[in-house]
Amino acid sequence: MAKVGITELAIRDAHQSLHATRMTTADMLPICDKLDKVGYKYIEGWGGATYDSCIRFLNEDPWERLRKLHAALPNNKIMMLLRAQNLLGYKHYADDVVEKFVATAAKNGIGCFRIFDACNDPRNMECATKAAKKSGVDVQMAISYAVTPFHTNEKYAELAKTYADFGADSICIKDMSGLLKPYEAFDLVQKIKAKVDLPIEIHSHATTGLSVATLLKAAEAGADWLDTAISSMSMGTSHSPTETVVEMLKGTDMDTGLD
């Protein structure tokens, strides 16, 4: 086991989960100076429903938000959640649109693309992944976690191997429903680690109350990075509190080292 990194979700997935993505750019900017000094692996700040919400509900330019966050977080890489061929919309887009969108996002401040397909179909992820690799920033490919007779840890590990072959820089286990149990997480991380030599990040919502224990067991199994949200933006349908996870690992060989 080694030092664990933390991705902070407060200004993207946390408010998307708790407040229907209604946090404005003006709400975010005052805290950015403090966030920038904490020492996170990534700060997730764009993508998901934020693009739609900016335009549909907040009367904001999502690209201007990205540029402002990039300027306000000079010491951090901003992560975005990208729906692969769907980009940030609700249908498949042409390859040339995907390529241009990804290049423009990288140019405006994205430092890591977390790319997922809800069907876990690598064919839907190939174009976005190639475009992200070409942009020169970090590329994380996500496994959408589900519990069915078909979705076994062995199949997820094989999927991770496919992602590695695509050129992923890291793998995310994306548990968007909070269904990943602690000991299942331990087994899943170990199985993926046996297949690929890449960092693994755990994204697990707190909806079912399992997430804190799940993050701990995943870290014990060798997960490299964990997704959390500042306590005021945590729990419920959001994520485990950053402060709780940092304190939980403090003094161990998994110590995050965060202030």
For each feature predicted by the language model, list its residue ranges.
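Catalytic cores and adjacent flexible loops of soluble metabolic enzymes
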Residues: 1-114, 118-259
